Amino acid sequence: MLLARMNPQVQPELGGADPLPEQPLRPCKTADLLVVKERNGVQCLLASQDSDAQPRETWGKKIDFLLSVVGFAVDLANVWRFPYLCYKNGGGAFLIPYTLFLIIAGMPLFYMELALGQYNREGAATVWKICPFFKGVGYAVILIALYVGFYYNVIIAWSLYYLFASFTLNLPWTNCGHSWNSPNCTDPKLLNASVLGDHTKYSKYKFTPAAEFYERGVLHLHESSGIHDIGLPQWQLLLCLMVVIVVLYFSLWKGVKTSGKVVWITATLPYFVLFVLLVHGVTLPGASNGINAYLHIDFYRLKEATVWIDAATQIFFSLGAGFGVLIAFASYNKFDNNCYRDALLTSTINCVTSFISGFAIFSILGYMAHEHKVNIEDVATEGAGLVFILYPEAISTLSGSTFWAVLFFLMLLALGLDSSMGGMEAVITGLADDFQVLKRHRKLFTCVVTISTFLLALFCITKGGIYVLTLLDTFAAGTSILFAVLMEAIGVSWFYGVDRFSNDIQQMMGFKPGLYWRLCWKFVSPAFLLFVVVVSIINFKPLTYDDYTYPPWANWVGWGIALSSMILVPAYVIYKFLSIRGSLWERVAYGITPENEHHLVAQRDVRQFQLRHWLAI
């Protein structure tokens, strides 16, 4: 099969030029031919001998790509956030706004990123050869992905620590009497509604063995008075973090050929464990009460704006658009791969997984409520408190608790690893495609990236590391990633053009996206993203962790981290504008015209300066 592909680096012609014969609006790519050969299921793309570019690596099998995308999208948030959001926002009624936002915004953005990466075969930065002024968006998402790696790997290290601690007949969070326990440690069997009173939820009680193991045994939080007093890294977590970094390096060092094989384990294991936990969970006493609470339908909650806001933010962060990962993964696909089908399949799998995980979670929460004779609302929670305190405590009361604990933390470990692999691949691919010297030394560059995340993660494994981690989690990938994806949607749909983007998709798959997708890309998705950005800013509150309130300077540091990535977008526009020689018109024209159409600028034929470009759908 022969594919005609072109991306000539045409130098701006500042002088006058004789008019050339009229050319079609979207010239075909006619430069180097890429010969596609199938060898034992591995596709090789061989450039013509005139090209100096190295052949781009491709996925060994289609399933490697699908598992990588699913593994990245399905992460810890599917387990520790969605079920609780569904419960507190009207149960089954929450699925209405959630599904609506999935259809009108989540899937279109997912589809857009896969198609963008697959057609251009570039990472998050160099993919913006379609509109050079927007390359700063690529650098922004790469930096955000790097920030996330600083703290996300620490959560994986916690999971590994818990996994190691589970290999004992008596789980260390089962009872009091350990060196880390406080004098206030209380046997969970003694806790019920009458003991806790009306103002203390069981999920907020800090003196259970499980809560003290997490905060005092693992984090050593009691030895820190705040973010100004974080102390030194803890050697146990340091060793776990080192193991995580080594695993990530050897999963990524040879590119998608190695990571595509690792995800066969990390992406499938969570489904096996989730199924086993679900089957066992529904047999426990009180499980039906938990599931009923999870699925209860309260349509009146849909009148509240917070329900719609929670649905919008959850669908965005759950699918993982905007981190450069989907672009990087898709760039290693075959040119004619059906990324439309992939987008529908993988985004649906992600959302269905979130929903199904709720049954496994709330069956256990129902069991806990039954055991302690409290209401479901007293044990329902989200985040780290759910997966590192409540769920482990529930597991410790089951027959064969060691087996269930090992299984559960293996699932968390797998969920974290393939998501972290995706984020690091976005950084590595994004920068390696932009700087060829990094691509030629991928193994060394991968080592540098993983070690850099390790070094900065050291701040998060100190005795006050949870304060640093919470700050990074709030600011590094909050408003900044929403802003970056908004700019991405505008760059593709408006400056590059939905019609031109649709023609690219037709070249790959033989059919153009329907009117629905084009309308979503041009109007609905940008409006959705703008809504979420505005809401995230309006709803911002000074940072807290439980009862601890961060000092004002910490919030300023957080906003500085957020702005450090966002500022790259306008900064690159200014840099590019100043680096282009020519008149004001020429500078703007070259900045918003795809690189393979720069020759049209010399002919004064710039689509973006014509009204029909902005009206096209």
Curated annotation (Swiss-Prot):
Residue numbers on the Extracellular membrane side: 89-92, 167-233, 283-306, 363-402, 465, 546-548
Free-text disruption phenotype from the record: SLC6A2 knockout leads to major alterations in norepinephrine homeostasis and the rates of norepinephrine clearance are slower in brain tissues from mutant mice than from wild-type controls. Mutant mice have aberrant response to antidepressant drugs and are hyper-responsive to locomotor stimulation by cocaine or amphetamine.
One Pfam family this sequence matches: SNF
InterPro entries per UniProt: Na/ntran_symport, Na/ntran_symport_noradrenaline, SNS_sf
Oligomer status and interactors: Monomer. Can form homodimers in the cell membrane; homodimerization is mostly mediated by cholesterol and lipids, and regulates neurotransmitter transport activity. Interacts with PRKCABP.
Function recorded in the entry: Mediates sodium- and chloride-dependent transport of norepinephrine (also known as noradrenaline), the primary signaling neurotransmitter in the autonomic sympathetic nervous system. Is responsible for norepinephrine reuptake and clearance from the synaptic cleft, thus playing a crucial role in norepinephrine inactivation and homeostasis. Can also mediate sodium- and chloride-dependent transport of dopamine.
Sequence positions that bind (R)-noradrenaline 2: 87-88, 382
Protein name: Sodium-dependent noradrenaline transporter
Family (UniProt): Belongs to the sodium:neurotransmitter symporter (SNF) (TC 2.A.22) family. SLC6A2 subfamily.
Record keywords, A-Z: Cell membrane, Cell projection, Disulfide bond, Glycoprotein, Lipoprotein, Membrane, Metal-binding, Neurotransmitter transport, Palmitate, Sodium, Symport, Synapse, Synaptosome, Transmembrane, Transmembrane helix, Transport
Catalytic activity: (R)-noradrenaline(out) + chloride(out) + Na(+)(out) = (R)-noradrenaline(in) + chloride(in) + Na(+)(in); dopamine(out) + chloride(out) + Na(+)(out) = dopamine(in) + chloride(in) + Na(+)(in); dopamine(out) + chloride(out) + 2 Na(+)(out) = dopamine(in) + chloride(in) + 2 Na(+)(in)
Lipoprotein found in the keyword field: yes
Glycosylation sites noted in the Swiss-Prot or TrEMBL record: 184, 192
